[in-house]
């Protein structure tokens, strides 16, 4: 999860059987983004995540990235993932404040934490647990 964006993933349920990587089917998730992928730091992060996920999975897991508005409006990404219309999405946590009022507390805000402070808080002081608790009722992980 970055300072200005988050990858929203919908749980697909518990694993029933264990299979080897060569037997695993290819997974391709439609992933709309809130920011154009041409924008440094705002939109290009999801391309890096997509590349790394594909590399780590041996090409078995692919994020099919869609530019803003191609699948759903930017403000509707979280709701679309929650409803099961999309498998994943990349958005800014602050866009969810109408549905999840506490999200501004965990998103980038003016005069807030510096990036290194935010990262320390998120990973070492309970920020990640707070974000997970806020999004869990929406089936977003």
Which stretches of residues belong to each language-model region?
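Short, low-complexity disordered leader/linker segments with a strong preference
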Residues: 1-28
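Contiguous mixed-secondary-structure segments that line small-molecule binding/active-site clefts
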Residues: 8-10, 51, 92-141
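Short loop->beta-strand "edge-of-pocket" segments that line small-molecule binding or catalytic clefts
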Residues: 29-30, 35-36, 135-141
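Extracytoplasmic "Venus flytrap"
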Residues: 30-47, 68-72
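Structural recognition of the beta-strand scaffold that forms the well-ordered cores
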Residues: 30-31, 63, 88-92, 141
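Short, polar/charged alpha-helical segment
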Residues: 39-64, 125, 129
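Alpha-to-beta junction loops
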Residues: 59-61, 77-94
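Short helix-initiation/N-cap motifs at beta->coil->alpha
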Residues: 65-79
């Amino acid at each position: 999860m970055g300072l200005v964006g988050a990858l929203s993933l919908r749980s697909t349920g518990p694993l029933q059987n264990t299979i080897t990587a060569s037997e695993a089917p290819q997974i391709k998730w439609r992933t709309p983004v809130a920011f154009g992928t041409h924008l440094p730091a705002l939109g290009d992060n999801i391309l890096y995540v997509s590349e790394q996920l594909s590399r780590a999975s041996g090409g078995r897991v692919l994020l099919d990235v869609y530019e803003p508005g191609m699948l759903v409006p930017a403000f509707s990404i979280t709701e679309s993932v929650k409803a099961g219309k999309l498998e994943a999405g990349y958005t800014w946590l602050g866009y969810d404040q109408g549905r999840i009022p506490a999200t501004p507390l965990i998103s980038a805000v003016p005069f807030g934490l510096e990036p290194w402070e935010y990262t320390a808080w998120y990973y070492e002081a309970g920020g990640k647990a707070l974000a997970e608790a806020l999004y869990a009722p929406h089936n977003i992980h």
